[in-house]
Amino acid sequence: MSTLLKSAKSIVPLMDRVLVQRIKAQAKTASGLYLPEKNVEKLNQAEVVAVGPGFTDANGNKVVPQVKVGDQVLIPQFGGSTIKLGNDDEVILFRDAEILAKIAKD
């Protein structure tokens, strides 16, 4: 059964899950030419859309995710659970530990 969700706001990650949306590469060159969609590569850069509350480890310590909503992060090329949205967008659900890096804002 396949159900398309209308927006990422209807997805609430559990435990240490992080919901991200891939940042789209520029489809326009510096000279103003538009590139065909198939020639625009997918970036490994994403924006955090939602974050789970964390989890309790075996010692009873609360482990919270290291990212927050709005952070720019680097994600692995493969992995995560892709979720299709009704507006032809998609979001990806990762574990916090699978996020490669947080991008510092200048």
UniProtKB/Swiss-Prot annotation:
Residues with the Phosphoserine modification: S31
InterPro entries: Chaperonin_GroES, Chaperonin_GroES_sf, Chaprnonin_Cpn10_CS, GroES-like_sf
UniProt-listed GO biological process terms: chaperone cofactor-dependent protein refolding; chaperone-mediated protein complex assembly; protein folding; protein import into mitochondrial intermembrane space; protein refolding
Keywords: Acetylation, Chaperone, Mitochondrion, Phosphoprotein
CDD domains, per the entry: cpn10
Compartments where found: Mitochondrion matrix
Disulfide bonds, paired cysteine numbers: none
Presence of the UniProt keyword Chaperone in the record: yes
Domain of life: Eukaryota
Modified residues annotated as N-acetylserine in this record: S2
A Gene Ontology molecular function term of the record: protein folding chaperone
GO cellular component: mitochondrial matrix; mitochondrion
Keyword Cell membrane: no
Post-translational modification, as annotated: The N-terminus is blocked.
Pfam families attached to this UniProt entry: Cpn10 (PF00166)
Other noteworthy facts: Present with 149 molecules/cell in log phase SD medium.
Subunit structure: Homohexamer.
Similarity remark: Belongs to the GroES chaperonin family.
PANTHER family, sorted: 10 KDA HEAT SHOCK PROTEIN, 10 KDA HEAT SHOCK PROTEIN, MITOCHONDRIAL
Described purpose of this protein according to its UniProt entry: Eukaryotic CPN10 homolog which is essential for mitochondrial protein biogenesis, together with CPN60. Binds to CPN60 in the presence of Mg-ATP and suppresses the ATPase activity of the latter.
Protein name as catalogued: 10 kDa heat shock protein, mitochondrial
Organism: Saccharomyces cerevisiae (strain ATCC 204508 / S288c) (Baker's yeast)
Lineage: Eukaryota, Fungi, Dikarya, Ascomycota, Saccharomycotina
Gene name tied to this protein: HSP10
